[in-house]
């Protein structure tokens, strides 16, 4: 889970994209709402190989649904599904008109989401609304004359609109019926302006029930009822915390509303309420999600989407009675004929091996996945390189796809130690098999180096239901050896908390270790990782949450780290910085990492993480220059059950030189700094034969140091450098495709210093699905004449940091007692004294 400081978000993002070459931009960047990685996955429709959205036909016998980015029709009691659309974009969220003639749906194409209308009688498919905005959740009025939907056309914010439709065409412009309102509330995950989503019509068409966070700080809001006209009267009929997926549906009897809720539990299930709210009760049960419910026309059945088996699936529930059945497309009739293509991936030894695959149509840029695979996609991309975001899936070694005739780009990767394979394949009318053999770039485990992702969330409110078994499969496909599944709250719920035991997951193997640990959330001090916990999750798992009983800034992170260490934990800060704060210009931050670095309560920094790597590296370098020895770790912050995610499992990873793969030995080597962190380039670095984490003690005088460096990378880089005390002291020339280099560099040492090796690109570059490729080693420390490493300027930087932080903390309104405040201010004071002494 990502943390932003109080620096201006617009400035921060601008700095990030400028450094990344201003190429890579978020999917659907016209949405002007913060924390896009949450609403994009939890609210916006996504390409999934299983069903994602369902609507009933005119009667009880027919269902229409989205699947694989196209629309389908299937009889309730049938086994054959008929495809109704076939691109060129991705089609979602069908809703059938009351007379059964039209489907209105949302279609992602041309860098926007438009509304389209499909005439089920003639087959004519035509645009209904294309305004360059994101238009979703279309719903027909009961008389078939209007469509209610949600659009970002007003200033990029979520509002409900209505559109009059006559004879299959829009009649007039859309009308915004919800009123824009600046709440002035300190919302951490949501926009300051209220949002309005998920409309559903009353049976007489005069009112809507919808979801809004008006007046609330946490969650996407409660259930509201309003007149279906601009500025209509609106009242809240029920409140509970929701996160984008409530999606109420009003029964035609006018009395009942079905919706999806996680009230008091970790998973969404179906609940019933009255049209005035009443006292809702739970209708379905299970440790998985049931979402997107829709009443049948006579209110005797409910169709919905479930992820009970991992992937999304379509179900129908009888009410009353409770009989539940899965609607399975056992045979598929495609709108455009398709041909079977089988992909077989083998290791250098010729054995089948798991890998990550991507199949993209050259003509349309559209991605395809097997029917039984989880479709996943990057959440940002360069529009000059592709029409849609990069899509991929994990394969166990053999995967079969049904594809329209045409030319496809097949891309195969397996972590960072195997070369990327890219092939162009022509698909004709005959079934075919395409074989892919992967080649190694490096075999780091043979040298005692084992990769790990220190920041993974197995389940975090995404489309899919992940399990340790599937997480292990994902890790094997990414050639990842250690997975730290960090249990963390998503507002009130804490997915995966039931998996914590204090031990390795029993599905771990000799080459893949899974540990369930914790990310500690605070809306103030900065997020952190607690690894290797033996006894318990630290609860409550958050602090500084306004308007809750956890509003206090105590426990601060120092207290949390002490609690973690008391049970053998290893502690670190995660996804740190988007920019380097300049305190001389009045910039501020709440981030507490300098406190814990000074007090010795943290063991590593996530230098490669969900942040700007060069900015984080620059702050880390300042810290190293004060004499603090803190190694680099790495973590993706991968939401492993998402369909749209910022990075796949293992995108950001740390390689640890533990010799053998043993969890506790691996953590000990991490703490000792025997690491390098990367999202692409692989590094080897030694100084006078000593590797990262080591110290070289030399007498007073001038000394020659011999650096041996190596680079192997699946992605080209622009710079390959040796850094001493934050300054480049050796630049290694890169030739050819700039993915490999070996060199010996002579350096001179006359004073104490730390040395790292790094490689990076100055712009986003495929196949690294990050702001830009970057890697750095932890330092080798050189001590000359017993003198400490010191920079008074950098020490003063942290004194200024703590001065502004102390002032903010002192005036915080959430303290439970003066004793709490004094304890925390005391921690800041001790840390300030540490840096002040080094500033002299």
Locations of the language-model features?
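Short edge beta-strand/loop segments characteristic of extracellular beta-sandwich folds
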Residues: 55, 211, 342-346, 706-712
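Long luminal/extracellular ectodomains of secretory-pathway precursor proteins
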Residues: 120, 124, 137, 146-149, ...
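Bacterial N-terminal signal peptides that target proteins for export
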Residues: 1-8
